[in-house]
Amino acid sequence: ALKKMTRANFVAGIGGTNTPCFFASSSSDQVINNNSTTKLTFSNEVYDVGGVYNPSNYRFTPGFSGKSYISVNLWTEDGQSSIFRVDLWLYKNGNPTVTTQQRYTSSNTTVERQAAALNVTMEHDNNDYFEMYGLLRTVDSGSATMLVGSGNNALFDNYFTAFKIIE
């Protein structure tokens, strides 16, 4: 039998929560050496509903089987203005799964600051885990830095976040 369309009946048919969820940012500068795949450290938990992010090993373990939306941003700086490539990798259970790359067509074109972002929906089991890795290339083979501001400059330029997708 059909029910009368009321707000209560309508709302009862939809719902769920987008938790667990977390948002972590960098709490200190991190040096990334040239052409070296580096685990990105997001040790400042802004929030962690469900205790799914570990700020010691920088892992997201969802704790449920389903799908999560995962997002990361990497903002880097090289004082010598020699960055020509920035790669981001999402690792699942220790293996690279998704990548995004910001590259110039030639190492003759370089920048002082470069950002890369990765946004993806991932299917997982309750005990799968996710980590973020980055790689930078500079023309002078020097390192670059994942920067963290302070005071009025303390923006969330570098972050790792995820939330549950309601199905």
Sequence positions of predicted segments:
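Extracellular jelly-roll beta-sandwich "head" domains, especially the C-terminal globular C1q domain
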Residues: 15-167
